[in-house]
Amino acid sequence: MKNLFLFCRSGYEKDCAAEIQQRATELNVGGFVKTNINDAYVIYQCFDDNGADTLVKELALSSLVFARQMFAAGELLSDLPEQDRVGPIVASLAALSKCGELRVETPDTNEAKELSAFCRKLTVPLRQGLKKSGALLNAESDRRPIIHVCFIGPGKAYAGYSLSHNSSPHFMGIPRLRMAADAPSRSSLKLDEAFGAFLTKEEQETRCRSGLNAVDLGACPGGWTYQLVRRGMMVAAVDNGPMDPKLMETGQVKHYRADGFRFEPPRKNVYWLVCDMVEKPARVAELMEAWAINGWFKEAIFNLKLPMKSRYKEVSVILETIGAILTENEIDFKMQCKHLYHDRDEVTVHLWIFPEKGVSYA
């Protein structure tokens, strides 16, 4: 297949396009971008007929900042007949065999969501047709490729596949999280999503466990602290503003009325550092670098507020700078960055510092 379909947030098509153009070029997969503002998706059309197949194998979705999900797709199926939508879609996927799941989706826009009821209605007969053709297994399997059919308008769809090990587990790449009634603010969902995006369930059990120490810089009123407390951690909440009284009643939070940029942890066994401050991204990045160089945390999740223009370029420069500075200081690390569903004009970074042997964070 020659088209790579990428889901993104509406309004961030240019950033997603700039990123895939650069990353595909690095993999020697030539092509060009097709996108429109506020469509919430990007098409990277490869010059090679098998270019998209190469990208879904070799380009890790987790390494892309602005793409929520991606799949290799054939040509746009336009003017699908009302009396038979299934036939042309099944025919376009004739090259696929024994896939494990079907997802009939739309981009994340209000206009496209109007097709959601139609997509749900189409899913059953389409699944039957794909099973009959052999493209889809009779029983779902999370180890086989996923068939995607994305309707971008009435009678218009891209159809293709993603690989289960290089794909978002979520429909349209969007996790469905519930806002807890006792959470101090909606920002709580950002950290909840971040833990799920950067750590597997098994990793969360060992690295987000009860008893770990955490620091929340810019904590007020406690949206991110809430997620740490919910996981059983002891939290140093740093902010000159007031914290949510219910959080303070848990006995797991100590409130430091201080400037997050000047705070130094009194204890040096901090495992998690989290930070969601409305500040220039370069300044936040410098703060994270300083904490890493001082050895004040093991893992960090922090947000970088984005400029109005050249957002991909800005993020790339900051991430490269963080990487260069940590490398210069001989710090071994792993870093990921994502524009999460619950992020707005910001991206979320996960930085994991590999500890020296024998260091305890309990």
Curated annotation (Swiss-Prot):
Catalytic site: 305 (proton acceptor)
Acyltransferase is among the record's keywords: no
Main location as per UniProt: cytoplasm
Record-level GO BP terms: methylation; rRNA processing
Chemical reaction(s) catalysed: cytidine(2498) in 23S rRNA + S-adenosyl-L-methionine = 2'-O-methylcytidine(2498) in 23S rRNA + S-adenosyl-L-homocysteine + H(+)
Protein's cellular compartments: Cytoplasm
Chain sites annotated for binding S-adenosyl-L-methionine: 187, 220-223, 239, 259, 276
Entries under InterPro entries matching the protein: RlmM_FDX, RlmM_THUMP-like, RNA_MeTrfase_FtsJ_dom, rRNA_MeTrfase_M, SAM-dependent_MTases_sf
Key word Transferase present: yes
One Pfam assignment: FtsJ
Disulfides per UniProt: none
EC number: 2.1.1.186
Keywords in alphabetical order: Cytoplasm, Methyltransferase, rRNA processing, S-adenosyl-L-methionine, Transferase
Gene3D superfamilies documented for this protein: 3.30.2300.20, 3.30.70.2810, Vaccinia Virus protein VP39
Stated role: Catalyzes the 2'-O-methylation at nucleotide C2498 in 23S rRNA.
Quaternary structure annotation from Swiss-Prot or TrEMBL: Monomer.
Similarity remark: Belongs to the class I-like SAM-binding methyltransferase superfamily. RNA methyltransferase RlmE family. RlmM subfamily.
Protein's UniProt name: Ribosomal RNA large subunit methyltransferase M
Originating species: Shewanella frigidimarina (strain NCIMB 400)
Name of encoding gene: rlmM
